């Protein structure tokens, strides 16, 4: 290259002097002092001590020794080396002539390099370039061959070539220095030696740095010049490929510009640089390719030459060091080639800390836990196998691992449930749908779109900020405007909660009901009674009743069965020997019928005629006719097995087949067998009377003919997708048509009823001059004063529209109803064995239900029934009768009740329709788990207490255990909160705000404790409705919780159970919850995912749970229920300890102890099983003995003496005929 005057050190990256300054970029200024210093070779001086002679002597000895060894063995060498050796021989003369002319080199005059032009680009001809490439290809095709050529000759020849190379290298360095100066001074001459073989020192100038490389050549530099500031002990390998040294001129020009900088940043070699398939241009500064010798090149050009032996030796050492560096490099970096090697310690330390933080962030908590678990498992396996021994014990145990409890799971089944005893005759579960793919079934599953839309709007309206209200704002506070609290009706004057106020009907039923229909207005009560179909067959009916203990009475709806039968029996003298009881499936029905009968008899409600429902007993000592729900009669049978207070019992609306009705059938059948004086009358509206008759032993069936008024039934032409919308349209059409008479709409549930009522009112408001309509909803949760409204007469000129559940199907006689709109759906309680709970779901009604509903329209005049489903759906998609409740609900409470009534063998109990085997076994297993049944299936003392609570058995158990643990006050609140469906609501548009407020109540260990916290906060805020609305809590639900709590507290007081508080020690509360729900326990698996310990079923924390996202994931939890949505979500979760599970649920869990072997555990399990077998054998013997005793006694007649007179009966000391003939004796 030509000289150029500009300083080579200008704008160049310098290495950092570690001792003097901190790392950074340095721009040197132009000055004479900043010229790069060039070290000149010192003049050769002979050693004073003669060390140079000694060194040459040693070298000669080593060479002779090497010659001796090499003669003894042949060598395997490559074809390339053989070619090199031939070249070496050919070039031997060149070396001698070179050495001879070295002294006169200064006097020689070399031809100056020719300037490159586009027509004369320099370099060799294209023909030579092609020949060279051909030779290269041939050489690569050859393999490896054996050669015994003398190694010593080759070594000598090679070293001579290396001396030549080194000499030329030094010359070129000098030239490059001069050319650099000349370029800076403005000279534009190019070197004509571009295509000559380049020395190892010269090559790195072509290596691209990130600042200079093109996109193609990025990151391809390898080493730097040895004379740069970043000094490297290993030289960069030489690239002497003919392919590399003969580039097209444009590329060469580009490289010449880049190569003026002698110092390049060393870069790591990416892995792709080594590959065969990589682009050849990428070999710019990367891994060296195959070297083809150091002597004279094949094309005759001069190779590397060395001036002295020291230079040759130095060059060989450099090559060896380069190889060593290369193989010892880690990812292309080492201490010499690392551009950050000489950075300041402070910078390095900060960078390392930053990288360490990043590394910690990158690994997820889940991954870290998996790694730890794997490591522990591997260590454990190695220690167990005995391959290794632990030398050091880590005494600094992690806190969580020290406290971790491992549970072993057993599946213990008591002998009475292991299959040897059969409890039911119905093996398969019963599904309450005829065809799950039918239109009605699909629409029932989807629900109403109108209801969904209405719910969202209501929540949005409730949650929106009422900015127009001054109360609660700063301006309102200044003006003295305060928020008005809704008056709380359930609070008495002394501030206590009276939960019975909303459930009492007697106060609202005092007023005499006024007639609304023309029929009722024109006729007196006596005339109305005589008009009923039952009046025509009164005497026949009484005769059959007199002759038979059990009678089935079948009559269509409106025939007068419910109201007249009790009065006829009373008039016939049955009330002289005891009360006449009449059971109804629902509370409203019992209350309304009692009111009607009391009016017909001309007395006040609660005197001669009274009713008894849950929370309210409207009877007195003078009561002769008592209407009640079937649950009340069932409770009375607990206290008095033979029902001695009653002379006759009427089981009304038996076709409803409620759970309590079916149990009563079985019980009363036994009671009638024991009491020959008791009369049992079963009434039904449907024609399925043969089933009842055969159940009671082929008893007579009495039919009451005819219905009072005809009913016209109209079906829908097409299936209705949205039953609420269709019902609203139909009701408005009927109302606006102007025909007289009230409307009754049947809807599945409370929400549907409320939405339908609102929609009708909204649509009427949109119409001008629409006739007045009073919309009255009725469902079981409605306060009694509103329920009583439907029986009161509407103002003149106002039509009534009653929207009801199937509560209005039976016994509910509302005067004046002419139009019935039947949606075709109802809500049924169905047991889900998977979660072990009952759920209310919408299902299509049965044909029997449909007939009952249409019958409502013909009570007081001719009517119409609009069915919102097609005639084919009625025939093909509806079941004939409803599936009995006993076949679709949880039987735990029924089993408890039957056991408490003394029924030992459930297979012997007479069910009209036996419950499915799965349901029965599930219920009994659950009761055994909770300790209500012992190992033989007998009732325990805990079970006897559980019967008294109208709760799920698990909740009853929780209450009972809480008295022993001393936290009954807190558990009472939690149980009350769990018995109410939803406490919080999330309005659309304010979900995040709602969630944030909800989080304030969260107790991180338990959702149950969060509920407790909510109630206590509400109590501290004086049961405020405003507080509830501010915190997105249903105020109505909280009031319901307070009522349930008061009711349960009364039962606890009756049972003499202590009410105590544990204060702030809520761990006891968690343990108490664990005692009731240990069978629904789950253990941690991964992050946020749990699996049921017993079944292995995956369970996930619900996002609304207090434990979700709290950063606290306990190893063991128990949950209240499992809800299936997109995942299996647990609802109401509480963290528990592993020891609690083992202590409270020993039939499932035991703590894994290191000392105990598997054999010991197996032996213990065998002992437990044999102990249970002995108990079972003893129980079977006792049961056998009890049966034999019963067989010895006479099964006929009553055990006790009867006091009721019957025709033909003779008392001792009396004449054969009674003193007087009864007034109504005979036909």
From Swiss-Prot:
GO terms for molecular function: 3'-5' RNA helicase activity; ATP binding; ATP hydrolysis activity; RNA binding. A motif (DEAH box) lies at residues 652-655. Keywords: ATP-binding, Helicase, Hydrolase, Isopeptide bond, mRNA processing, mRNA splicing, Nucleotide-binding, Nucleus, Phosphoprotein, Spliceosome, Ubl conjugation. The modification Phosphoserine is found at residues 56, 199, 224, 1194. PANTHER family: ATP-DEPENDENT RNA HELICASE (PTHR18934), PRE-MRNA-SPLICING FACTOR ATP-DEPENDENT RNA HELICASE PRP16 (PTHR18934:SF91). Belongs to the DEAD box helicase family. DEAH subfamily. PRP16 sub-subfamily. This is Pre-mRNA-splicing factor ATP-dependent RNA helicase PRP16.
